[in-house]
């Protein structure tokens, strides 16, 4: 089984997600105690997809995250670079236009999408700044980006408990339910190494996004960042 290192070599990350694809959604539901469904609902609200809009759902995995946008009447493109994830997504949701693509070199023309979103995927990209610039490039003027990512709890006592869960409790639980438990050791390590909420906001601004803001979910376990492409 593959476990990616924190230098996030693309072939390692893709292989790791290929390994967990079959049980990915179930494992996430169990490890997050069902909170992942709450977080994804908040993403859908922030994207605010409308009929006939074009939405890019990057790092869509099995495309479960794309369903709310499709139900809203938008044309959603689930995009991922794990072929294993895409195969599962195509089997489960054959009507969606699943697309293989790298976040640092997106296979779309400039100014294509009304909104772009990435949930729990930006942390796995080797070059975060290039990915943010690529998302900006493919977004129409006036469009928005919504990023949902694991982050850093703001209340110190809770942050301590959460860190203990990541490093001590999560790995054995993952061993019981995941087809590749080492992937969840990487998950814990990559969360600890991820930028803080203000740091990620600043990187969004440097990529060109305006009106950047964020709000914390579940006490900062997850942060929802949003920005706009100026008209």
Curated annotation (Swiss-Prot):
GO terms for molecular function: demethylmenaquinone methyltransferase activity. Its EC number is 2.1.1.163. S-adenosyl-L-methionine binds at residues 62, 80, 102-103, 119. It comes from the Bacteria. Pfam families: Ubie_methyltran. Pathway: Quinol/quinone metabolism; menaquinone biosynthesis; menaquinol from 1,4-dihydroxy-2-naphthoate: step 2/2. PROSITE patterns: SAM_MT_UBIE, UBIE_1, UBIE_2. It catalyses: a 2-demethylmenaquinol + S-adenosyl-L-methionine = a menaquinol + S-adenosyl-L-homocysteine + H(+). GO terms for biological process: menaquinone biosynthetic process; methylation. InterPro entries: SAM-dependent_MTases_sf, UbiE/COQ5_MeTrFase, UbiE/COQ5_MeTrFase_CS. HAMAP family: MenG_UbiE_methyltr (MF_01813). Belongs to the class I-like SAM-binding methyltransferase superfamily. MenG/UbiE family. Methyltransferase required for the conversion of demethylmenaquinol (DMKH2) to menaquinol (MKH2). This is Demethylmenaquinone methyltransferase. The lineage of its organism: Bacteria, Bacillati, Actinomycetota, Actinomycetes, Kitasatosporales.
């Amino acid at each position: 089984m593959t476990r990616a290192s924190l230098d996030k070599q693309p072939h390692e990350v893709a292989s790791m997600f290929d390994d967990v694809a079959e049980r990915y959604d179930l494992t996430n539901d169990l490890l997050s105690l069902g909170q992942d469904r709450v977080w994804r609902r908040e993403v859908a609200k922030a994207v605010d997809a409308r009929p006939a809009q074009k939405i890019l759902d990057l790092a869509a995995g099995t495309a479960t995250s794309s369903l709310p946008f499709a139900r809203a009447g938008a044309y959603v493109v689930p995009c991922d670079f794990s072929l294993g994830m895409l195969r599962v997504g195509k089997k489960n949701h054959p009507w969606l236009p699943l697309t293989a693509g790298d976040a640092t070199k997106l296979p779309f023309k400039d100014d294509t999408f009304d909104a772009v979103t990435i949930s729990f995927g930006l942390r796995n990209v080797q070059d975060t700044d290039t990915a943010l610039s690529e998302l900006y490039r493919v977004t129409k003027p006036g469009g928005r980006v919504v990023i949902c990512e694991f982050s850093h709890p703001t209340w110190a006592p809770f942050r301590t408990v959460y860190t203990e869960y990541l490093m001590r409790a999560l790995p054995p639980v993952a061993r019981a339910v995941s087809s590749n438990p080492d992937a969840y050791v990487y998950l814990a390590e990559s969360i600890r190494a991820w930028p803080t909420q203000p740091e990620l906001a600043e990187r969004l601004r440097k990529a060109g996004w305006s009106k950047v803001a964020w709000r914390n979910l579940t006490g900062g376990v997850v942060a929802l960042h949003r920005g706009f492409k100026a008209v």
